[in-house]
Amino acid sequence: QEPDNAAFFCSVVRYASLNDHSTGALYSPDLSEVILCNKLPSCNQAFIGRKDEIKAIASHLSNQSVLFITGMAGIGKSEVAKAYAQTNRKKYTNIIYLYYTGDLRKDIANLTFADDSVEMNEEVRFQNHYKVMQRLHTDTLLILDNFNVLPKDEPFLKELMKNNMQLLITSRCKLKNYDSIEIKELDKEKELTELFYKHCPSAKRDPDSVSAII
Protein backbone atom coordinates (compact mmCIF):
# COMPACT_ATOMS: atom_id res chain seq x y z
CA GLN A 1 0.00 0.00 0.00
CA GLU A 2 2.88 2.40 0.72
CA PRO A 3 4.07 2.63 -2.91
CA ASP A 4 0.51 3.52 -3.98
CA ASN A 5 0.32 6.25 -1.34
CA ALA A 6 3.69 7.63 -2.43
CA ALA A 7 2.57 7.74 -6.04
CA PHE A 8 -0.69 9.42 -5.04
CA PHE A 9 1.01 12.14 -3.00
CA CYS A 10 3.54 12.68 -5.77
CA SER A 11 0.67 13.21 -8.21
CA VAL A 12 -1.05 15.65 -5.85
CA VAL A 13 2.12 17.70 -5.37
CA ARG A 14 2.76 17.77 -9.12
CA TYR A 15 -0.81 18.85 -9.85
CA ALA A 16 -0.62 21.63 -7.28
CA SER A 17 2.75 22.85 -8.55
CA LEU A 18 1.51 23.12 -12.13
CA ASN A 19 -1.71 24.96 -11.33
CA ASP A 20 -2.43 28.27 -9.62
CA HIS A 21 -5.87 27.81 -8.13
CA SER A 22 -6.05 31.41 -6.90
CA THR A 23 -6.10 32.73 -10.46
CA GLY A 24 -7.07 29.68 -12.49
CA ALA A 25 -3.75 29.84 -14.33
CA LEU A 26 -2.14 26.68 -15.64
CA TYR A 27 1.61 26.23 -15.61
CA SER A 28 3.80 24.29 -18.00
CA PRO A 29 5.99 21.39 -16.95
CA ASP A 30 9.65 22.38 -16.72
CA LEU A 31 11.37 21.09 -19.87
CA SER A 32 14.93 22.01 -18.91
CA GLU A 33 15.86 18.33 -18.67
CA VAL A 34 13.47 17.18 -21.40
CA ILE A 35 14.55 19.29 -24.38
CA LEU A 36 18.33 19.11 -24.71
CA CYS A 37 20.71 21.43 -26.59
CA ASN A 38 18.06 24.14 -26.92
CA LYS A 39 19.72 27.06 -25.16
CA LEU A 40 18.49 30.46 -26.30
CA PRO A 41 21.20 32.02 -28.50
CA SER A 42 22.81 35.07 -26.92
CA CYS A 43 22.20 38.55 -28.25
CA ASN A 44 24.94 40.15 -30.28
CA GLN A 45 27.29 42.02 -27.95
CA ALA A 46 26.73 45.16 -30.00
CA PHE A 47 22.94 45.03 -29.49
CA ILE A 48 21.58 48.38 -28.35
CA GLY A 49 18.27 50.19 -28.09
CA ARG A 50 14.95 48.64 -29.09
CA LYS A 51 13.52 49.29 -25.61
CA ASP A 52 10.22 50.53 -27.04
CA GLU A 53 9.90 47.48 -29.29
CA ILE A 54 10.63 45.12 -26.38
CA LYS A 55 7.99 46.86 -24.27
CA ALA A 56 5.50 46.62 -27.15
CA ILE A 57 6.14 42.88 -27.46
CA ALA A 58 5.62 42.40 -23.72
CA SER A 59 2.40 44.41 -23.82
CA HIS A 60 1.03 42.42 -26.74
CA LEU A 61 1.92 39.01 -25.32
CA SER A 62 0.22 39.90 -22.04
CA ASN A 63 -3.07 39.88 -23.97
CA GLN A 64 -2.50 37.73 -27.06
CA SER A 65 -0.45 34.59 -27.51
CA VAL A 66 0.95 35.08 -31.05
CA LEU A 67 3.03 37.94 -32.42
CA PHE A 68 5.07 38.31 -35.59
CA ILE A 69 8.21 40.47 -35.60
CA THR A 70 8.64 41.73 -39.15
CA GLY A 71 11.16 43.84 -41.02
CA MET A 72 13.73 43.80 -43.79
CA ALA A 73 16.66 41.40 -43.83
CA GLY A 74 19.39 42.34 -41.36
CA ILE A 75 17.30 44.91 -39.48
CA GLY A 76 17.58 42.98 -36.20
CA LYS A 77 14.37 40.95 -35.87
CA SER A 78 16.08 37.93 -34.34
CA GLU A 79 18.09 40.09 -31.96
CA VAL A 80 14.92 41.82 -30.75
CA ALA A 81 13.21 38.47 -30.18
CA LYS A 82 16.21 37.19 -28.20
CA ALA A 83 16.47 40.44 -26.25
CA TYR A 84 12.79 40.23 -25.32
CA ALA A 85 13.25 36.65 -24.13
CA GLN A 86 16.34 37.50 -22.08
CA THR A 87 14.73 40.59 -20.56
CA ASN A 88 11.60 38.65 -19.60
CA ARG A 89 13.19 35.30 -18.79
CA LYS A 90 11.74 35.22 -15.26
CA LYS A 91 8.21 35.29 -16.67
CA TYR A 92 8.62 31.94 -18.35
CA THR A 93 8.99 28.36 -17.19
CA ASN A 94 10.36 27.45 -20.63
CA ILE A 95 11.83 29.36 -23.56
CA ILE A 96 12.10 27.20 -26.68
CA TYR A 97 14.10 28.42 -29.68
CA LEU A 98 13.24 26.96 -33.08
CA TYR A 99 15.05 28.00 -36.27
CA TYR A 100 12.76 27.53 -39.25
CA THR A 101 14.30 25.65 -42.17
CA GLY A 102 11.25 25.37 -44.41
CA ASP A 103 9.38 22.48 -42.78
CA LEU A 104 7.90 23.11 -39.34
CA ARG A 105 7.07 19.49 -38.59
CA LYS A 106 10.64 18.48 -39.42
CA ASP A 107 12.04 21.30 -37.27
CA ILE A 108 9.98 20.10 -34.30
CA ALA A 109 11.07 16.51 -34.96
CA ASN A 110 14.71 17.63 -35.06
CA LEU A 111 14.64 19.05 -31.54
CA THR A 112 16.64 16.82 -29.21
CA PHE A 113 14.56 15.28 -26.43
CA ALA A 114 15.99 13.24 -23.57
CA ASP A 115 13.89 10.19 -24.46
CA ASP A 116 14.75 10.16 -28.18
CA SER A 117 16.30 6.95 -29.46
CA VAL A 118 18.08 5.96 -32.65
CA GLU A 119 15.21 3.59 -33.47
CA MET A 120 12.75 6.49 -33.82
CA ASN A 121 12.09 7.76 -37.32
CA GLU A 122 11.25 11.40 -38.01
CA GLU A 123 7.48 10.94 -37.74
CA VAL A 124 7.70 9.16 -34.38
CA ARG A 125 10.00 11.87 -33.03
CA PHE A 126 7.62 14.55 -34.25
CA GLN A 127 4.61 12.90 -32.60
CA ASN A 128 6.47 12.44 -29.30
CA HIS A 129 7.81 16.00 -29.29
CA TYR A 130 4.52 17.58 -30.27
CA LYS A 131 2.60 15.75 -27.55
CA VAL A 132 4.88 17.45 -25.03
CA MET A 133 4.39 20.84 -26.68
CA GLN A 134 0.62 20.45 -26.52
CA ARG A 135 0.86 20.37 -22.71
CA LEU A 136 2.46 23.80 -22.53
CA HIS A 137 0.78 27.01 -21.40
CA THR A 138 1.34 30.76 -21.60
CA ASP A 139 4.34 30.55 -19.27
CA THR A 140 6.19 28.93 -22.17
CA LEU A 141 7.59 31.10 -24.97
CA LEU A 142 8.38 29.54 -28.34
CA ILE A 143 10.54 31.70 -30.61
CA LEU A 144 10.14 30.64 -34.24
CA ASP A 145 13.02 32.38 -35.98
CA ASN A 146 13.63 32.91 -39.70
CA PHE A 147 10.02 32.22 -40.73
CA ASN A 148 10.43 33.92 -44.09
CA VAL A 149 7.39 32.47 -45.82
CA LEU A 150 3.74 33.46 -45.82
CA PRO A 151 1.76 31.60 -43.14
CA LYS A 152 -0.41 29.98 -45.82
CA ASP A 153 2.72 28.34 -47.25
CA GLU A 154 3.49 26.45 -44.02
CA PRO A 155 0.64 23.94 -43.48
CA PHE A 156 1.47 23.19 -39.84
CA LEU A 157 1.59 26.77 -38.55
CA LYS A 158 -2.16 27.05 -37.90
CA GLU A 159 -2.04 23.84 -35.88
CA LEU A 160 0.89 25.12 -33.82
CA MET A 161 -0.95 28.39 -33.17
CA LYS A 162 -3.87 26.51 -31.60
CA ASN A 163 -1.75 25.65 -28.59
CA ASN A 164 -1.73 27.64 -25.36
CA MET A 165 1.94 28.67 -25.33
CA GLN A 166 3.16 32.07 -26.49
CA LEU A 167 4.59 32.30 -30.01
CA LEU A 168 7.04 34.97 -31.13
CA ILE A 169 7.77 34.62 -34.85
CA THR A 170 10.35 36.55 -36.86
CA SER A 171 9.67 37.08 -40.56
CA ARG A 172 10.68 39.27 -43.49
CA CYS A 173 7.16 38.99 -44.88
CA LYS A 174 4.63 41.78 -44.52
CA LEU A 175 1.51 40.31 -42.96
CA LYS A 176 -2.01 41.73 -43.05
CA ASN A 177 -4.06 39.17 -41.16
CA TYR A 178 -1.78 38.59 -38.16
CA ASP A 179 -0.71 40.75 -35.25
CA SER A 180 2.79 42.05 -35.90
CA ILE A 181 5.34 44.64 -34.89
CA GLU A 182 7.66 46.01 -37.56
CA ILE A 183 11.29 46.61 -36.70
CA LYS A 184 12.54 49.77 -38.36
CA GLU A 185 15.92 51.46 -38.59
CA LEU A 186 17.62 52.60 -35.40
CA ASP A 187 17.37 56.25 -34.46
CA LYS A 188 20.13 58.02 -36.42
CA GLU A 189 20.97 60.69 -33.87
CA LYS A 190 21.41 58.42 -30.89
CA GLU A 191 21.25 54.66 -31.47
CA LEU A 192 23.10 54.45 -34.80
CA THR A 193 25.82 56.70 -33.45
CA GLU A 194 26.16 54.56 -30.33
CA LEU A 195 26.32 51.41 -32.48
CA PHE A 196 29.03 52.98 -34.66
CA TYR A 197 31.11 53.82 -31.59
CA LYS A 198 30.78 50.24 -30.32
CA HIS A 199 32.39 48.99 -33.51
CA CYS A 200 34.87 51.86 -33.79
CA PRO A 201 35.58 53.45 -30.37
CA SER A 202 38.31 55.71 -31.76
CA ALA A 203 35.68 57.49 -33.87
CA LYS A 204 34.48 59.31 -30.74
CA ARG A 205 37.31 61.76 -31.37
CA ASP A 206 35.66 62.89 -34.60
CA PRO A 207 31.87 63.03 -34.08
CA ASP A 208 31.33 65.30 -37.10
CA SER A 209 32.77 62.69 -39.45
CA VAL A 210 30.66 59.98 -37.82
CA SER A 211 27.54 62.08 -38.27
CA ALA A 212 28.37 62.55 -41.94
CA ILE A 213 28.90 58.80 -42.43
CA ILE A 214 25.64 57.66 -40.88
Predicted segments, located by residue:
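Conserved P-loop NTPase "ATPase switch" module shared by AAA+ and STAND
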Residues: 133-152
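Alpha-helical sensor/transducer elements of the RecA-like P-loop NTPase core
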Residues: 79, 109-111, 159-212
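A short acidic, amphipathic alpha-helical/loop segment
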Residues: 34, 80-84, 154-159, 212
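Conserved adenine-nucleotide phosphate-binding loops and their immediately adjacent elements
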Residues: 9, 24-59
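Short amphipathic recognition helices of helix-turn-helix/homeodomain-type DNA-binding modules
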Residues: 1-31
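Conserved ATPase-coupling elements of RecA-like P-loop NTPase cores
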Residues: 147-157, 178-179
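Post-nucleotide-binding-loop coupling segment downstream of the phosphate-binding loop, primarily
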Residues: 46, 52-60, 65-137
